A protein has these predicted regions:
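Conserved glycine-bearing catalytic or ligand-binding loops at nucleotide- and phosphate-handling centers
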Residues: 1
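Conserved alpha/beta-domain cores
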Residues: 6-172
Length: 172
């Protein structure tokens, strides 16, 4: 009953502008894990997606999605939410999210949440990373896409990731 009451109240106020008491506007951006969640963003008057967790494409599948499958997924989200922005985060695998059927790609670590995961994993498995980056770049032709790298720990990782991104841009 409390949940229904909360949801009813939310439906009443979700059309109001998101503004702080001192008049500063705030963008309400949703977090999504799957392309079919875009309807919720529009239903609740979200202004876009602030975090698209792309690793769930990998985690919810028995196999690694192809570049084309990723592109179609990202394109669907971008087109359905246009002209709203969509922030697509590259793979955050490892730690609590190893890829099913590919455990050998994720070494055992004493602290997997801070170790070989996310951007570090992508930079060591460049073929996976490039497939994803090309898919994101192609999807960006269909709307307002922003890119987020997870778990960057320094300027060198950012430079390496951006170099791979530029390679992909040149390939396309």
């Amino acid at each position: 009953e409390r949940k229904k009451s909360f949801e009813a109240r939310l439906l009443e106020v979700n059309r109001l502008p998101a503004v702080t008491l001192d008049g500063v506007g705030v963008a309400l951006l949703a977090n999504i894990e799957k392309a079919d969640e875009t309807g919720l963003v529009t239903q609740y008057f979200g202004e876009g997606v602030g975090l698209y967790r792309t690793e769930f494409l990998y985690l919810n599948s028995a196999r690694v999605p192809t570049e084309q499958e990723q592109y179609l997924d990202y394109r669907k989200v971008v087109e359905e939410l246009a002209p709203r922005p969509v922030v697509i985060r590259t793979l955050d695998l490892g730690g609590d999210k190893p890829m099913a059927g590919n455990a050998e790609l994720f070494p055992k670590e004493s602290n997997p949440f801070m170790g070989f995961r996310a951007i570090r994993w992508c930079l060591e498995n460049v073929a996976f990373f490039k497939d994803q980056l090309r898919a994101i770049l192609m999807a960006s032709a269909h709307g307002k896409v922003r890119l987020m790298y997870p778990m960057i720990s320094g300027a060198e990782e950012l430079a390496r990731a951006n170099a791979v991104l530029e390679e992909c841009r040149q390939e396309l």
